[in-house]
Curated annotation (Swiss-Prot):
Disulphide connectivity of cysteines: C50-C64, C52-C60
SMART domains: END
GO molecular-function term, one example from the UniProt record: hormone activity
GO CC term, one of those recorded: extracellular space
Disulfide bond found in the keyword field: yes
Swiss-Prot/TrEMBL site (Cleavage) positions: W70, V71
Pfam family, one: Endothelin
Keyword field: Cleavage on pair of basic residues, Disulfide bond, Secreted, Signal, Vasoactive, Vasoconstrictor
Family per similarity comment: Belongs to the endothelin/sarafotoxin family.
Propeptide: 27-47, 71-180
UniProt key word Signal: yes
Protein name: Endothelin-2
Length: 180
């Protein structure tokens, strides 16, 4: 009979060999080469699939910059990890962004699709703040209020119906079982 510590060492060794073989097989079957570590690269390189024409276009920034941490703040959603805003002039390209690889079909579709919302720093044409102050919005405010009241009434009626149903039909927890 084998001693207990020897048996445990044998089991641990067999497990390590099996895990090592499994790891090497999965690495051999993967199609893409492993990414180099941060130390091997020298400095941290940001993973980007494209370059946005405007930093104010948050949807574009979120799509293009793959390693950004987004933090919800009370007034806005702020991207962290982008560094300082660019000090160059805004591009006058008709596209939303430029892809780094033309073979990335998702990126090409996203960057070159029309129409895409224009981002503006100052309230101007088409900005949400302008829409709040137009007379067109004020005329539909009554309709919005009516719809909100309808939604509230429907929710209230549904809740009352559920409460009445619960008090009317007290079901046993074992209603499907027959007593023998």
């Amino acid at each position: 009979m084998v001693a207990l510590p020897t048996a445990w060492c044998s089991v641990a060794l067999a497990l390590l060999v099996a895990l090592h073989e499994g790891k090497s097989q999965s690495a051999a079957t993967s199609e893409e080469p492993p990414a180099p570590s941060a130390r091997a690269r020298g400095s941290h390189l940001r993973l980007r699939r494209c370059s946005c024409n405007s930093w104010l276009d948050k949807e574009c920034v979120y799509f293009c910059h793959l390693d950004i941490i987004w933090v919800n703040t009370p007034g806005q959603t702020a991207p962290y990890g982008l560094g300082n805003p660019p000090r160059r002039q805004r591009r006058s390209l008709p596209r939303r962004c430029e892809c780094y690889s033309t073979r990335d079909s998702a990126c090409v579709t996203f960057c070159h699709q029309k129409p895409w919302p224009k981002a503006s720093a100052v309230p101007g044409e088409g900005s949400p703040t302008d829409l709040l102050w137009t007379s067109k919005t004020r005329t539909t405010a009554g309709e919005l209020l009516r719809r909100l009241r309808d939604i509230f009434a429907a929710k209230r009626n549904f809740t009352r119906h559920q409460q009445q149903k619960a008090t009317r039909e007290p079901e046993s927890s074992h209603s499907r079982w027959r007593k023998r």
